[in-house]
């Protein structure tokens, strides 16, 4: 074998190993990729039953019904379409009607979204980016909010007021190292 043919075989072998590694990475990731959809997209695209995705929107006013054993039924809307949701488990503390959420789960044959995870917003101005983008694309986005946080820092509690007097003195020393 000549030097040139050995070099070509080495390059081909490296390329094959790289292609195999890339294929394994992509196949491993395909099971963990979850797409985001708004209620309008679910209605328009006819999502096949059993497809796993994230559903984002606002909890429709008057739709929350709590059942036995932590079963909760509610509807998610983006003002164009509404999708009924069933969830079993503890809801986040910030979950309430009219607030933005993202639920992850599957759509059943009857068109009910069966969520296994529900994430709620974290303050009065937050909306999941995907939900905001979907509302903007539909022309239903409203900038700003009617409530604003006070801008006067003097109304905030002093930093030392929250410190308990029974704190472990060694904890501060360990955390400073």
Swiss-Prot record:
Residues 145-166 have a biased composition (Basic and acidic residues). The chain crosses the membrane at residues 8-28. It is found in: Cell inner membrane. GO terms for biological process: cytochrome complex assembly. Residues 29-177 are periplasmic. It is a single-pass type II membrane protein. SUPFAM superfamilies: Heme chaperone CcmE (SSF82093). It holds the Pfam family CcmE. Heme binds at residues 122, 126. Keywords: Cell inner membrane, Cell membrane, Cytochrome c-type biogenesis, Heme, Iron, Membrane, Metal-binding, Signal-anchor, Transmembrane, Transmembrane helix. One of its GO terms (molecular function) is metal ion binding. Residues 1-7 are cytoplasmic. InterPro entries: CcmE (IPR004329), CcmE-like_sf (IPR036127), NA-bd_OB-fold (IPR012340). Its main location: membrane. The keyword Transmembrane applies. Residues 133-177 are annotated as: Disordered. GO terms for cellular component: plasma membrane. Heme chaperone required for the biogenesis of c-type cytochromes. Transiently binds heme delivered by CcmC and transfers the heme to apo-cytochromes in a process facilitated by CcmF and CcmH. Belongs to the CcmE/CycJ family. This is Cytochrome c-type biogenesis protein CcmE. It comes from Methylorubrum extorquens (strain PA1). The gene is ccmE.
């Amino acid at each position: 074998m000549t030097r040139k043919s050995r070099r070509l075989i080495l390059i081909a072998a490296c390329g094959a190993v790289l292609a195999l590694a890339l294929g394994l990475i992509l196949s491993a990731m395909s099971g963990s990729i979850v797409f985001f959809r708004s209620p309008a997209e679910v209605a328009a695209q006819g999502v096949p039953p059993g497809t796993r995705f994230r559903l984002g929107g606002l909890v429709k006013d008057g739709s929350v019904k709590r059942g036995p054993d932590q079963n909760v039924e509610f509807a998610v809307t983006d003002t164009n379409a509404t999708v009924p949701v069933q969830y079993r488990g503890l809801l986040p503390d910030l979950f309430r009607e009219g607030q933005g959420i993202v639920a992850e789960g599957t759509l059943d044959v009857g068109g009910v979204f069966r969520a296994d995870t529900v994430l709620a917003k974290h303050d009065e101005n937050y909306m999941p980016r995907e939900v905001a983008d979907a509302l903007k694309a539909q022309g239903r986005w409203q900038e700003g909010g009617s409530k604003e946080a006070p801008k006067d820092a003097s109304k905030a509690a002093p930093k030392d007021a929250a410190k308990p007097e029974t704190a472990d003195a060694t904890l501060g020393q360990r955390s400073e190292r």
